[in-house]
Amino acid sequence: MELTTRHPLERPIMRMFVAHSSGGSEKTIQHLGLSPDIVKFLREKWGIKELYPPQQEALPHALDGKNLMLTIPTASGKSLVAHLTIAHRLKHDLINQKAIYVVPLKALASEKYDELKEIANVVGLKVALAIGDRSGEINSIEDSDILVCTSERLDSLFRNRSNLISNIGIIVTDEFHLLHDHSRGPTLEVLISRIRHKKPDAQIIALSATVGNCEDLAKWLGAELI
């Protein structure tokens, strides 16, 4: 049984399983209502032939605009749920609004920036990276549809560019379990609280491999827990 991996977001493909599956992975992805260009991109560029069960459960909620808290193991495709939701909703439901993807570390921000650029190009969206040490960041932020940044950088942007909140359609928080971290948690909590107060209709997607009291946190976010 051959296992093939071509992209960080791709799950290993069990070719014998795919060949004998009753519905086929492409049918599963197509039934989500994604554009044909995205479906083709997933198949041909990222080599994604099927979805994990948690992805199949989470994506309909996310694509419908519901708040979502996704707590599944590492390498189970949490980021893919966020990426597809951003690409789909910014083109169909949230015209002229922004998605913000918040991560704890600069290295992770660069990784997610590269991933999002790939899928954003398919649907004509612009992605900006804001980590505080790049020239021309402000111009790229204002011109972007999707902003990838650390929580500290977003806090700084909110303090100096208060109008940014009014344009947020989706906020994704990766490594959400860091809400319990003594150094990073307070900043993240304040950011989410500020967005929920100033832009209550913004969709929140919280991604975490492990998080304590997940039911309470999901209730606080008003989110579906998966």
Segments the model singles out, each with a brief description of its role:
Residues 1-53, 57:
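N-terminal intrinsically disordered, low-complexity tails of helicases
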Residues 33, 39-226:
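Conserved P-loop/Walker A NTP-binding site and adjacent catalytic elements of P-loop NTPases
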